[in-house]
């Protein structure tokens, strides 16, 4: 099959494209290599993907409609996996316009490409942030998404609604995957597990927002890639949660990393940001039933794999700048 994967130089995009290439699929990778975080990570991922002869890369700005629609000149694309986005709750508060352009306009342009090119399947990467500070745990897909706590979450809700519109009017098979805190090797340096491992290894303080009792459903990246690939076979329209199936407090996460690295963390506590969700836990019943998907990694196993990647790439990781 031939897949268009946006955000191919990104964390999840890299792992998803790699998995597809290893199974002899053809990939059109799209990314604009922006400097949202250290581009050395993005370039290193692209270098790995470019070793595959079935990988073709385009440095394309998805907010530019004409550039996106020019992709219709490609030979028949079977499915689009749309991962390119501006991510991050706190960052979106300082520049909401960038999130509107890169998360909403870009999605609209891709949906239009699907329409005019008769691409049958479209998968949108969304986020558990759309649920706001929901108190119902585990959270299923029927929980209302009308009270987002950040422009990031609001932009993803808008992208979801546009995706439904194009399914409804043009019959595009559409899967929306709401990710719960993804982590793993080659991760994003603005995410907590990457930050904590790097800072603890370097004997630098880590910052914990709140008292350490807030919790997240952490999801290992190859589990996410498996869910994305399975979703491209969907007929119809569905929203799925993609989570690890259990919640881990920040305090416990630090202990897991300390045990792995055999080093103690230097901890600084600061007040919890009001845009942060206090607890998250995915109900993954729906995706298990419809796509026959289950996570393979628990938090201890996933952190161990992530830590191994760090220890195997210390020189490279030491050069990576962390993003606040």
For each predicted feature, which ranges?
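N-terminal Rossmann-like NAD(P)+-binding domain of SDR-like oxidoreductases, especially those catalyzing
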Residues: 1-182, 297, 304-305, 310-313, ...
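Residue-level recognition of oxygen-bearing side chains
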Residues: 67, 98, 105, 144, ...
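NAD(P)-dependent short-chain dehydrogenase/reductase
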Residues: 42, 133-138, 151, 157, ...
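Short alpha-helical
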Residues: 63-66, 87, 187, 248-249, ...
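Generic secretory/membrane-interface signal
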Residues: 25, 34, 97, 153-154, ...
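Generic recognition of short, well-ordered alpha-helical segments
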Residues: 15, 40-44, 70, 91-94, ...
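C-terminal substrate-binding subdomain of Rossmann-fold SDR/epimerase-dehydratase oxidoreductases
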Residues: 18-19, 200-324
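Residues that form or immediately flank small-molecule/cofactor binding pockets and catalytic motifs
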Residues: 62, 144, 184, 213, ...
């Amino acid at each position: 099959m031939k897949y268009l994967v946006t955000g191919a130089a990104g964390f999840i995009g890299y792992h998803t494209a790699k998995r597809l290439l290893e199974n002899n699929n053809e990939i059109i990778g799209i990314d604009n290599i922006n400097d949202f975080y250290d581009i050395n990570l993005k370039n290193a991922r692209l270098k790995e993907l470019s070793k595959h002869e079935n990988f073709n890369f385009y440095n394309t700005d998805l907010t530019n409609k004409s550039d996106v629609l020019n992709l219709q000149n490609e030979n028949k694309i079977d499915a689009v996996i749309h991962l390119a986005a501006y991510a991050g709750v706190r960052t979106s508060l300082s520049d909401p316009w960038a999130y509107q352009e890169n998360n909403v306009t870009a999605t609209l342009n891709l949906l239009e490409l699907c329409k005019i090119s008769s691409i049958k399947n479209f998968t949108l990467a969304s986020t558990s942030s759309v649920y706001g500070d929901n108190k119902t745990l585990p959270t299923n897909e029927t929980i209302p998404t009308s009270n987002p706590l950040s422009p990031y979450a609001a932009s993803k809700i808008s992208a979801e609604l546009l995706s439904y519109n194009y399914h409804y009017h043009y019959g595009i098979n559409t899967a929306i995957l709401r990710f719960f805190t993804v982590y793993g090797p080659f991760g994003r340096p603005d995410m907590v597990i990457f930050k904590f491992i790097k800072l603890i290894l370097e004997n630098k303080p880590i910052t914990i927002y709140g008292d350490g009792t807030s919790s997240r459903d952490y999801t290992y990246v190859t589990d996410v890639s498996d869910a994305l690939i399975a979703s491209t076979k969907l007929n119809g329209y569905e929203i799925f949660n993609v989570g690890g199936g259990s919640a881990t407090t920040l305090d416990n996460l630090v202990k897991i990393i300390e045990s792995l690295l055999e080093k103690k963390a230097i901890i600084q506590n600061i007040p919890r940001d009001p845009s942060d969700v206090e607890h998250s836990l995915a109900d993954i019943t729906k995706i298990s039933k419809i796509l026959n998907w289950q996570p393979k990694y628990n938090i201890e196993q996933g952190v161990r794999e992530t830590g191994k990647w760090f220890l195997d790439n210390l020189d490279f990781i030491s050069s990576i700048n962390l993003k606040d």
